[in-house]
């Protein structure tokens, strides 16, 4: 298959996250390969936070898709009405109208609060949900950028505490994401982050969301590279055609 055909196929989320896309290693694989190799290859189970995050992304990047998102007018997920709605509509998830309202506010804030951020996201030449494939440490990798704009790879994140974002970025694997994306797209990466909590100003009228722009530093990306390299060493050890150890026979053996 030609490169252009691969990229076009990966634009479809079902292909990207399905069997076709799984022939490529992605950032979501790196944490397992590094810390729990036996989990490599397992699909990440869906959960409500994924659905809410997906809706936030679609409102900003793919508003036409957001119109098709399943939204139900009930008070909560742990209700009989919610479960009946899923069953009646053959769905595995839906978001409530209250959740949809809150996420719409978050998306509007992201798009309109800061003129530089707005210009970056809504640039005339910006590309959204752009896939890429390439080789890293001798193995095929894939990535899908939220936004390509003004010579940057831009990734949208939400967080419960923006003041811990820099520290948590290492824990959540954003450093490895930055390395992989910068390597494959050949351009620097920055994160646009929005807090999930709507807050009231202390000294003036009005409400706000915490919002931040976090360009990636060389140090941050290099640390990500080291983690990816370690992950790929484990891949070669357990899963390559020249594997030297069986993952089924592996136990943790580490001095304290």
Predicted ranges, named:
Residues 170-179:
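Gly/Ser/Thr-rich active-site loops/lids in small-molecule metabolic enzymes
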Residues 1-142, 248-254:
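Metal-dependent nuclease catalytic cores that hydrolyze phosphodiester bonds in DNA/RNA
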Residues 131-133, 152, 157-159, 194-196:
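Histidine- and/or cysteine-centered catalytic micro-motif in compact active-site loops
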Residues 167-171, 221:
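Flexible, glycine- and charge-enriched loops at secondary-structure boundaries
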Residues 143-165, 181:
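Conserved catalytic cores of phosphodiester-cleaving nucleases, focusing on short active-site segments
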Residues 100, 105, 180-256:
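Metal-dependent nuclease catalytic regions and adjoining charged, substrate-binding loops involved
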């Amino acid at each position: 298959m030609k490169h252009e055909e691969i990229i076009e196929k990966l634009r479809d989320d079902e292909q990207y996250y399905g069997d076709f896309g799984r022939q490529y290693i992605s950032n979501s694989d790196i944490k397992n390969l590094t810390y729990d190799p036996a989990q490599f290859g397992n699909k990440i189970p869906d959960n409500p936070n994924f659905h809410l995050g997906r809706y936030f992304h679609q409102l900003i990047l793919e508003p036409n898709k957001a119109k098709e998102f399943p939204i139900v007018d009930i008070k909560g997920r742990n209700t009989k009405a919610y479960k009946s709605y899923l069953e009646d509509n053959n769905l595995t998830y839906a978001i409530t109208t209250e959740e949809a309202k809150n996420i719409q506010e978050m998306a509007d804030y992201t798009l309109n609060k800061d003129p530089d951020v707005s210009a970056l996201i809504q640039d005339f030449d910006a590309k959204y949900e752009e896939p890429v494939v390439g080789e890293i440490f001798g193995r095929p990798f894939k990535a899908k950028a939220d936004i390509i704009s003004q010579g940057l790879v831009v990734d949208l994140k939400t967080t419960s505490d923006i003041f811990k974002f820099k520290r948590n970025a290492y824990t959540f694997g954003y450093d490895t994401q930055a390395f992989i994306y910068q390597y494959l797209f050949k351009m620097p990466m920055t994160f646009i982050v929005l807090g999930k909590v709507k807050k009231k100003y202390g000294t003036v009228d009005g409400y706000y969301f915490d919002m931040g722009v976090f360009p990636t530093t060389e140090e941050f990306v290099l640390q990500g590279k080291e983690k990816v390299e370690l992950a790929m060493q484990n891949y070669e050890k357990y899963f390559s055609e020249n594997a030297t150890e069986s993952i089924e026979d592996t136990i943790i053996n580490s001095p304290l």
